[in-house]
């Protein structure tokens, strides 16, 4: 198979972890006789510094004409510490999602046998956890009207959803549940929010189309609690943008390290794959960042091209590196810590 992949390294540790994912992907392509052409493009703070736009038109054109996008990280503290900044790196990610039609974020949460004791939660609570979040990405409060009134002393952010937006996200959720454990949980706050009531009634109306799927409805605060108490009780979770943003980060600690969790953002056309961790600017250029989440994001990419054996090869070599302790300092726990580039080389060599 020939694949054209847009490569958006982004900011902070993004370039370093992306480099390792490329190494591993190229090793997979060589082993399984595929051809990958990589097409680098700027985004985030790097793009602001270069052209003044966190998601330039040139970057969009490269992404839109590619089979998939592999993305590193976005963000820089100089923007975080400047509330007056009109242009911010994160605006590039929001713009990219909107313009590429990436309306659903797929965020798996699972455990690694060799790292189960690194989780802050008890082994018996989390062992065997295998759930996936489907978070709506292009609607809700992040994209609603916002502003200030009363000389800046009053602020507002509007949350708006259409039935069509909920339906397309829920459809993917039901389809995913059908291919997994046939359980779907819709997370909302329907006791107080009108948008949540729209979510609930829309999903309820779709239930009859998927009679094999067991559907439940839970308030977001209850789910935040149950994710800590018994995450194994969930299979597929669908939710709106803000709730999903918070819950997926909460769930990321189940595995023991945010540096291990991959994700995908999907729509009707191109798909984007990225680690869930941030840009970690204090580690940038030090060759110490954990690349495994980015490598596993590449595995998700292969899987979505129906290259399941290739995806499994990546997951197997990642599990092997964890079991044998060939890891970066965040996972070393007093043992030998390897550099980001060394981990990437080892993974590629052992594919």
Question: Model segments located where?
Answer:
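Glycine-rich phosphate/diphosphate-binding loop of Rossmann-like nucleotide-binding domains
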Residues: 6-23, 28-29, 151-221, 233
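Buried hydrophobic packing segments
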Residues: 21, 25, 203, 294-302, ...
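N-terminal glycine-rich phosphate/adenylate-binding segment common to multiple enzyme folds
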Residues: 49-156, 242-244
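Glycine-rich phosphate/pyrophosphate-binding loop and the adjoining helix
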Residues: 138-180, 184, 190-192, 210, ...
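Buried hydrophobic positions in well-ordered alpha/beta secondary-structure cores of metabolic enzymes
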Residues: 11-14, 67, 134, 173, ...
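N-terminal beta-loop-helix "entrance" segment that forms/cooperates
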Residues: 33-57, 225-227
């Amino acid at each position: 198979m020939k694949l054209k992949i847009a490569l958006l390294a982004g900011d902070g540790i993004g370039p370093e972890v992306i480099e390792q994912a490329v190494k591993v992907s190229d090793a997979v392509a060589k082993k399984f006789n595929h051809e990958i052409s990589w097409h680098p493009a700027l985004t985030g703070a790097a793009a602001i510094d270069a052209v003044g736009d966190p998601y330039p038109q040139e970057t969009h054109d490269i992404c839109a004409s590619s089979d998939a996008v592999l993305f590193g990280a976005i963000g820089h503290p100089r923007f975080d510490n400047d509330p007056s900044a009109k242009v911010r790196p994160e605006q590039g990610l929001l713009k990219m999602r909107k313009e590429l039609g990436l309306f659903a974020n797929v965020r798996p949460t699972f455990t690694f046998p060799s790292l189960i004791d690194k989780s802050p939660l008890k082994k018996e609570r989390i062992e065997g956890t295998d759930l996936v979040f489907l978070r709506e990405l292009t609607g809700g409060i992040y994209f609603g009207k916002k502003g200030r009134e009363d000389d800046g002393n009053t602020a507002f952010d509007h949350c708006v959803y259409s039935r069509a937006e909920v339906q397309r996200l829920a459809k993917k959720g039901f389809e995913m549940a059908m291919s997994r454990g046939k359980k779907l949980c819709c997370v909302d706050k329907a006791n107080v929010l009108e948008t949540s009531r729209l979510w609930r009634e829309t999903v309820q109306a779709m239930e009859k189309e998927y009679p094999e799927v067991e559907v439940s409805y839970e308030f977001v605060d209850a789910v935040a609690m149950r994710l800590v108490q018994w995450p194994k009780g969930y299979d597929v979770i669908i939710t709106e943008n803000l709730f999903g943003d918070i819950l997926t980060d909460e769930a990321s600690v189940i595995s023991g390290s945010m540096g291990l969790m991959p994700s995908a953002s999907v729509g009707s056309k191109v798909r984007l794959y990225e680690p869930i961790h941030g840009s970690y600017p204090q580690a940038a250029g030090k060759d110490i960042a954990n690349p495994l989440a980015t490598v596993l994001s590449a595995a998700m990419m292969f899987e979505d091209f129906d290259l399941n054996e290739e995806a499994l090869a990546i997951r197997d070599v990642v599990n092997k590196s964890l079991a044998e302790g060939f890891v970066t300092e965040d996972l070393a726990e007093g043992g030998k810590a390897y550099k980001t580039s060394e981990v990437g080389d080892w993974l590629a060599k052992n594919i």
